[in-house]
């Protein structure tokens, strides 16, 4: 590999996120529905390095070039496979940091998939997903990058049918950052353990499209603790609902909030309202 290879990594929203328990090893069990989005996105420009190992550079402050999801993914793959190619990675961030969109997890998955594609002895998808789960709960999903239900610590991935074609998803990213580690700590401190049986989305089919409503199945265990510290995010969610969204929810541990609109014109009106308030807004026709 002599020429630069540019890896594009997108992001996700959690259309449902239950933190079901905390294990003795510190990992959290989840039950979540992931939807991949192609915008916003990051780029990883990969070139050949001078010696075995990986070097990461990034112009964004707050990202440790020696210890991040990209280096952790490389180290995990190298340990499992013995394959240690010399790589330089320039990380060009487009996904907002601390937004609950899984940008760092997508970066890790991009490197894992890249290493798998160039390794003389690939590890296979199952092993790759196990490695991915050690890096973060979102990483196995990004290995697949299709609508999925994730359980366990994120390593149990089941593709699902997405029934709401024609809906418009509006993603709002305010100038707020929420640390995932802080959010989990706050959740543990609140001792919130919510378990419920869900039948709306399954691997074989879905509930009647007409049964979709604001509160029918969307849930995020992080919302109570994050909204308590960042009430402006609750206000953002409520504003989206007032603009005619069929549903709105914080993604991941925040701070981004997304909404689903049945009518494209309602989404466009909300888009115009929000973009003038120092909020990055993206539209996706599903």
From Swiss-Prot:
InterPro entries: GHMP_kinase_C_dom, GHMP_kinase_C_sf, GHMP_kinase_N_dom, IspE, Ribosomal_Su5_D2-typ_SF, Ribsml_uS5_D2-typ_fold_subgr
Record key words, sorted: ATP-binding, Isoprene biosynthesis, Kinase, Nucleotide-binding, Transferase
Keyword Nucleotide-binding: yes
SUPFAM superfamilies given in the database record: GHMP Kinase, C-terminal domain, Ribosomal protein S5 domain 2-like
Entry annotation: catalytic residues: 12, 138
TM annotation in the entry: none
GO BP terms in the entry: isopentenyl diphosphate biosynthetic process, methylerythritol 4-phosphate pathway; terpenoid biosynthetic process
UniProt GO MF annotations: 4-(cytidine 5'-diphospho)-2-C-methyl-D-erythritol kinase activity; ATP binding
Catalytic activity: 4-CDP-2-C-methyl-D-erythritol + ATP = 4-CDP-2-C-methyl-D-erythritol 2-phosphate + ADP + H(+)
EC number(s) per entry: 2.7.1.148
Keyword Membrane among record annotations: no
Residue numbers binding ATP: 96-106
Pathway(s): Isoprenoid biosynthesis; isopentenyl diphosphate biosynthesis via DXP pathway; isopentenyl diphosphate from 1-deoxy-D-xylulose 5-phosphate: step 3/6
Function: Catalyzes the phosphorylation of the position 2 hydroxy group of 4-diphosphocytidyl-2C-methyl-D-erythritol.
Family from the record: Belongs to the GHMP kinase family. IspE subfamily.
Protein's UniProt name: 4-diphosphocytidyl-2-C-methyl-D-erythritol kinase
